Amino acid sequence: MSSISRDEVAHLARLSRLSLTDDELDEFADQIDGIIEHVQKVSNVDTEGVEPMSHPSDLAGVMREDEVHPTLTAEQALDQAPASQRDRFEVPRILGE
């Protein structure tokens, strides 16, 4: 069974722009090894004669006609908002200019 090395985890962290401590590198290497082990177990399951499926249930999508129901007006929806502008919620900027 192949296992992922600490150096490979460090390489993945660099590619992902993550800064990991030595303890985190060891911990993640162990976790990834566990994941790989589980995937290998699933890969070894005998699926001979099992038809491929996209969903474990035979349920089909149930369609219905859209029904219009009363909704809040913009004024009602914004009534308790801390800030609004032009009938929209105003929120603090989280991304740069």
Swiss-Prot record:
Catalytic reaction equation(s): L-glutamyl-tRNA(Gln) + L-glutamine + ATP + H2O = L-glutaminyl-tRNA(Gln) + L-glutamate + ADP + phosphate + H(+); L-aspartyl-tRNA(Asn) + L-glutamine + ATP + H2O = L-asparaginyl-tRNA(Asn) + L-glutamate + ADP + phosphate + 2 H(+)
EC number of the protein: 6.3.5.-
Key word ATP-binding present: yes
Catalytic EC class: ligase
Keywords: ATP-binding, Ligase, Nucleotide-binding, Protein biosynthesis
Subunit structure: Heterotrimer of A, B and C subunits.
Family: Belongs to the GatC family.
Protein name in UniProt: Aspartyl/glutamyl-tRNA(Asn/Gln) amidotransferase subunit C
Species of provenance: Corynebacterium kroppenstedtii (strain DSM 44385 / JCM 11950 / CIP 105744 / CCUG 35717)
Gene from which the chain derives: gatC
